[in-house]
Amino acid sequence: MSYLYKAFGWVLDLCYKIVPNYLVAILLFALIIKIVMFPLGIKQQKNSQKQARLRPKELAIRKKYAGRNDKATQQKAQQEIMELYQKENYSMFGGCLPLLIQFPIIIALYNVIRNPLQYMLGIAGDNLTKIQEIFMSLTGAERVMTDLEMMPTIRANFSEFAAYMNGITLDKVPSFNIGAFDLSVTPNASGVSNWYLLIPILTFVFAFGSMKLTKKFTYQAPQAEGTNNALSMKIMDITMPLFSAWIAYTLPSVIGVYWMFQNVLSTVQQIILSQMFKIPKFTEEDYKQAERELAGSSKKNKKAEKAH
């Protein structure tokens, strides 16, 4: 992971050098990362497209067992659906690999953003430890969670830290001030202006809006009757944005800002992918044809069983 941290840190530092405004640099950084990960989005969309093509046949199977909620019947329906997937060379887990690949990348991204001294400026080891000790001495803090929380103190008292900054001058230290806002400030910190509460509130709004919009451009697989999937999805629609807001409330404001940018870019990406790889639409006749094919297949199987 350390190589990934260094690579992302180099990209973020390059963005800041190109545009010496941290808000714009974060947006540029988020855009670059989204472009790099775009092929994973393509793979997911293609997998959804393939699943959507099987929708009439899958719904025909579910309709065949509709109204019978006993365990044996539900297992039989699920078995037939899995056999359909196997026959059509569709894997339910085909869309999981991109998500699994993205997970460590997301962790690396947030670590890089939270620790600019280490990953943007390359300060580590004894020098970083000494900087942390000076920070705690000046502020009375008992510990240091991230580099971001030290940045305002370092800029305000740069002479105290200069000897341990690897020759980096004050003008090279990233400024997190955007107008009256300091993006290195944590919204739940004591003595912080209530205006910083806008960050977690907006993070929730962006996350919730992005989730709703993305769903409109994403294939939604049919659910079996009598399951709790619909309720679970509704709960997720609220809990995930709330989780985003909590993270934005308890971590430096720049994390919330980055999360907002990512939500916007993810929504735009899904809209683009939905146009590149369109989900097929079916008529009522298509669904009836699938039911007739299923009925015909069932009759053939029964005849074959009797013959044996």
Kindly give the residue locations of the regions a language model identified:
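Helix-loop-helix
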Residues: 1-308
